């Protein structure tokens, strides 16, 4: 059974590492959080001042 040279393992590691880093960075920068609507913010602010004691 033929064995791989160490440079091939290094090349595989580099290729998979670059692929993983690119995948993670694309996922990180493609995430766009949705901002809450102004009506929801007003309701939250009004309800937070409703003391029950």
Curated annotation (Swiss-Prot):
Protein name according to UniProt: ATP synthase protein 8
Membrane spanning residue stretches: 4-24
GO biological process: proton motive force-driven ATP synthesis
Coiled coil regions in record: none
Gene this protein is translated from: mt:ATPase8
Keyword list, A-Z: ATP synthesis, CF(0), Hydrogen ion transport, Ion transport, Membrane, Mitochondrion, Transmembrane, Transmembrane helix, Transport
GO cellular component, one term: proton-transporting ATP synthase complex
Keyword flag Transferase: no
